[in-house]
Amino acid sequence: MTDPSGTEAPSKVGSFLIWQQPHLIYLAELLYRANPSEELLKKYNSLIQETAEFMYSFATYEEEHDRYVLKGAIPAQETLRAAETVNPPFELSYWHFAMQVAQTWRERTGLERVPEWDVLIEKLSPLAYNDEQLYLAAETAVDTYKDIRFTSDHMAVLGAVGILPMNQLIHAGYMKNTLHWIWDNWNWDKTWGWDYPMTAMNAARMGEPEKAVSALLMDKRTNTYLVNGHNYQDGRLRIYLPGNGGLLTTVAMMCAGWDGSEGNNPGFPKDGKWNVRWEGLQPLP
């Protein structure tokens, strides 16, 4: 995390976060999907390629296991420590998605795919899970479902399929197991405003639209919106915007769908109680 001049932000957490790195690739892809043009390709391709080059360089190859890992970072679930965290799930999924998109942009602009990037995509570590077939907060967080430190803050594992599409690193059944456990047991009083939209996005992609709606309407302090639109968290934060952006994105996804979704308004229950009207929205990847 940096300021506009590139100076590192003063934070004991922000300096170790990596999950924002692929944002530029994701946002540029959304722009292109909404309005494909040579102008967009020329405007953003160099930034996408440089971002992907950093992401490739950040991943570590483990010869013993013939795989790439992500480590030395604080994940989106900020209760984990950089020095001991390996393979956080949201970051793995985001790396996989963004590197694929970067290769696609190379093809769109007449460039050859980077072979080393394809190797990374193929050999990126799958998400780690326990004996109960629940995904862990990180490969190294073996006590994920026993230690409240790992069941508080952002349930970022749900973002691995929700904010992002399903991919080869993830087993759909294990992800649904994880959603159900989190729904019933998470420390919901220690969450943030964008956790509810993220949970809803996961539920929608997992074929549970009732949970998607219920997540958006969950009665928790950090899921509160004041009359001025502020997603109130606590008295310390005078403004907090991630929840607003998450809510808008999630509702749009529940309406317009995502690549591979079926039918109209796929994120809403088909119980005859919903009459959803919308216009001008685009499906997510």
Report the location of each language-model feature.
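Active-site core of glycosidic bond-cleaving carbohydrate-active enzymes
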Residues: T2-T7, K12-A34, E38, K42, ...
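Surface beta-strand/loop "capping" patches
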Residues: N265-P285
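Short, glycine/acidic-rich hinge or "gate" loops at secondary-structure transitions
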Residues: L40-K43, T60-L70, L111-W117, N264
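A non-catalytic, amphipathic alpha-helix used as a structural packing/dimerization or gating element
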Residues: K43-E50
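Intrinsically disordered, low-complexity coil segments
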Residues: L80, Y232-Q233, G260-N265
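Acidic/histidine-rich catalytic neighborhood
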Residues: E50-R108
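A general structural signal for short secondary-structure junctions and capping/turn motifs
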Residues: T60-Y61, F150-S152, L281-L284
